[in-house]
Structures are given as C-alpha cells and as structure tokens.
Curated annotation (Swiss-Prot):
GO cellular component: cell surface; extracellular region; phosphopyruvate hydratase complex
CDD domains: enolase (cd03313)
Lineage: Bacteria, Bacillati, Cyanobacteriota, Cyanophyceae, Synechococcales
Cofactor note as given: Binds a second Mg(2+) ion via substrate during catalysis.
Protein name, per record: Enolase
Function: Catalyzes the reversible conversion of 2-phosphoglycerate (2-PG) into phosphoenolpyruvate (PEP). It is essential for the degradation of carbohydrates via glycolysis.
Binding site for Mg(2+): D246, E287, D314
Positions with a binding annotation for (2R)-2-phosphoglycerate: Q167, K339, R368, S369, K390
Family: Belongs to the enolase family.
Organism, as annotated: Prochlorococcus marinus (strain NATL2A)
Compartment annotation: Cytoplasm; Secreted; Cell surface
Active site: E209, K339
Any one Gene Ontology BP term: glycolytic process
Amino acid sequence: MADSLELVIDTIMAREVLDSRGNPTVEAEVLLEGGAIGRSIVPSGASTGAHEAHELRDGGKRYLGKGVLQAVNHIEENIAPALCGLSSLDQATVDSVMKQLDDTDNKSNLGANSILAVSMATARAAANGLGLPLYRYLGGPMSSLLPVPLMNVINGGEHAANNLDFQEFMLVPHGAESFREALRMGAEVFHTLKDLLSQKGLSTAVGDEGGFAPNLESNKAAGDLLMQAIEQAGFKPGEQVSLALDVASTEFYAEGQYCYGGNSYSSEQMVEELAGLVNAFPIVSIEDGLAEDDWDGWRLLTKKLGKNVQLVGDDLFVTNTLRLQRGIDENIANSILIKVNQIGSLTETLEAIELASRSSYTTVISHRSGETEDTTIADLSVATKSGQIKTGSLSRSERVAKYNQLLRIEDELGSQATYAGLVGLGPRGSLKG
C-alpha cells in the first residue's frame, strides 16, 4: 500500500491534442509525490444538448476557432496551484475545489473540458498510485459486471453526411454469454451489413462513430437492413441481437413540431411513429425520442412505451442530477445516458449514476462523437455496474479502444466476470425475454 504522502498531487500539466474529428481537445496529466501519473483526454460532442456544461473554445482563426489553449492555460495557471498538495484519493474535494474556482452553474469560466480533464486524470493517478486498475479503484472489489454494448452500426443525423434523420441505429447483442462473445456477434453482423450494403450498391463509408452512413429511403429501411444483417450473420433478431435507436430528435425539432423525412409531426404523432417502429422491429431502447425540453411529449412517450422499452434521456437529462430528479418526480423516461463531459467532473457523474440507480432508472455509459484513445468510460461502466455502454461501431480505433479495454477487464476478472445480458436493460429488458 502506498504511503499517503505518495498520493498527494505534486504537479498538473495540460496540452492541446486532437480528437477523432481532427479538432483540438484537452489532455491533462496529474503527477503524484510518489511518482504515479494519471493522464486523461476529454471528448466532445456534435449533437450537444443546450443544458450541457460549457466546453471552452478559443475562437479566432486558429483551428477555425476550435482551439483549447485557454482551457489548457486555466489548468496550468488556475487549477494546478489550487490542487497541488491535496490528496488524489479525495476525488470529491478535488472536484469541489475546481467547481468553486469556476463559480458558474455550467462551468463557463474555466471550461468543463479543463475541469473534466483534471478530474479524470486525478482518479487515474490515484489508481496507479495504489497499484489498482481504474475500474477497481472507482468501484471496489465487487465490480465485476461487464456491460452490454449498444453498437452504432448505421450513422445518421449530425454524425454522418447522409439523408438519415435519426442519428444512431444500434445492435444490442444481449444474448451472448460473455462480453467477448457479444463483441464477436456485433462484429460479425457489422461485416455482414457491409456486404449487404455493397451488394445493394450503397455506400460503405463510415460516419463519426464508425458506423456505415448510406443514403436510405427511410429510418424503417435502416431497420430492415439491420434485421437482414442479423439473420444472415446467423443470429436470431430479438432473441440474441436486438435493436436500439438514438433519435436525437432535438436536432429536427422547431416551434413544437418534429420535421424530418419531408413531414412534420406533433409530439403525439412522433410518439405514434416511434410506437410503430417498436411494433415493427425488436427495439429494446430508444434514446432522445422527444426533444430536450418537450417534457409533455416525453410524458406521453413514457406512458406509451415505458413499460416495455428503455427510454433513455440524453439531451433531456445531460448527466445533470437536477434535470434527472425532475424526470424521476414526473415519471418521465426510465433511463439516463451518462456522458462525463456533459456535467464536467467525475464526482458529479457518479452522483448522477447513484441517483438513477436509487430511482430504478437504468444507466448507459456513453462516448461522444468526437472521441480519443482515452478508455476511462470502459472502466467506469464496470466500476458503476451500469450494465450498458455506448462506444460506437466496430471500426475506428477510438471506438475499438474501449471494447478492447473491456476485453482486458473481462480477462482480468476471470471467473468473477459476469455479462449483463438482457438484465442490463433493467425491468424492461426482462419483459423482452
């Protein structure tokens, strides 16, 4: 066991690096007195919720305004002096000090990207200082649940330059016996889907998250393709591999109407559209089926589908306990997407997960469309026993890095490892069995 003095924060450094879209992002390194180092890189999103914590960008001509040197400077000039001398084991204090330094509701002074980079790097430094893997440090000795991956194999919306309005069409290989088998199942369907697209003369170019980005007639056509790919790969739709959607409906919502596919829908009509898709396909999860501030629409959707389908709030909740508590109080949605950079610190992320768990809401640990080689969310999914992870398709190294880390964790756990399977989707998952 490391001496407590060895776990004190000695030095904090930061630099500007690139994410998977070639845009700048923040990397932080935390060095402890005993020599242990933690490094973390923050992601960024394309379809960002209006209520997310503020991502600080430089503006100006450099990197077309997307530079993050201000955030880097905040880390080295403001955050580092305040944190050096604190114990890396006291994550809550570290994050609280940064939050107080910023002194805004949305972290707009220092930037959520600067605060989060240091927050995650501190946790990793502490884990390294103790000689523990990150999932074990954050979750304790009982953390052994491997998540079901929600694999985004057809990209649309803000994640691709095609005509699909819905943002993500995902595979859910819940019928596997292990995470390793689930990954194999997803990969086999992914490659079968590529062959199908080629046979139909459709594009096999990939979008931001590594899924294919073909032009298709409709959202239903994407569902038909996935069903065909699942069957041709030798799996049973609904029994072994189901589907999930990220509608990202805020992106096409304006003046009380949902406008896509050449049509305009009221909230009530949008709910019926989604119900029709659920009846047509084995859909176990729908993310952001309604817009981020259409609370009345969300109420209708939850009443209509909430007993049988996981209804995930992403833009709706933005990993924020205040918005999640409103959803809980008003019986809206039944699941929350967890994105560390939406709220901007590890402590607040864990608080959101804890609130969801206490309230019988499922959690889905998620990447962003602008990702990096950082694998923190893989460890976080195991540490928190979330049971579900979204980290893209079966291509692009920044996506596959998280899958590979989960493979390592599963191997390390050995016989202790449990694959979440359908149970990972909570009560609604069991209804699908």
